[in-house]
Amino acid sequence: MPEQNHARHSVVLSETILNVSTAEPIQFIDLTDRINQHLTENEVENGTVTVFSRHTTAAIKINEAEDLLIEDFKNMLRELCPSGRTYNHNDMSRRQPPIAPDERPNAHSHLMHLLLSTSETIPVIDGRLALGTWQRIFMVELDGARQRQVMIRCESYHPHEKAETVELRAVEGGIGRSSAANQRALP
C-alpha cells in the first residue's frame, strides 16, 4: 500500500481595503492589476482570493474587458432596470426611518445589483489569479459617482515547515500601506 502524505498546512490570511472613486452612474472598473499587486506584496502563492463590495449598489463581476462589450453590459442593465420608472423605494414619503440625509432615488441601482453579485472568489496558483485568457475582475458601479470600498481577502496555504501561524494583515486606505496585525495559530 502506498504511503500517504498527511502533511499539515498553515493558512496565512491577508486583507486590504481598496478605496475606489467612480465618475459615472454605471461604470466598470477593472481591479485585476490591483488584486495581483496585493498577491505579490503579501507573497500569496497558492490559495484563494475573495473580492467583496461593501455596498448594495456596487457589484463585483468577472468578465471580458472589451469596450464594446462593456457598453452592451451597461445598455442591458439600463434596459432591465430603467432609472425613470416609478419605484416604491424612491418614494421617500413612504419609507421607514432612518433615511440618510443624502438618500438618492436609486431603486434601479439596487435592482441592478440584485442581478449581479457582491463578491467573487478566485483560485490563486503560483502567485497568480487563475483567470481565463479574457477574464478580468470588475467593480461595477451602479449608482455613481461615489467613493467605494472593495475588500480583498486572501487565504494562502503553506506547508507547516514554511509557516506555522495564521497571520492577519489589515490595510486601510489601499494597497501598499500594510501593517501587521493579529497572529494566531490554526489547529
Regions inferred by a protein language model and the residue ranges of each:
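Active-site histidine-anchored catalytic micro-motif
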Residues: P2-P187
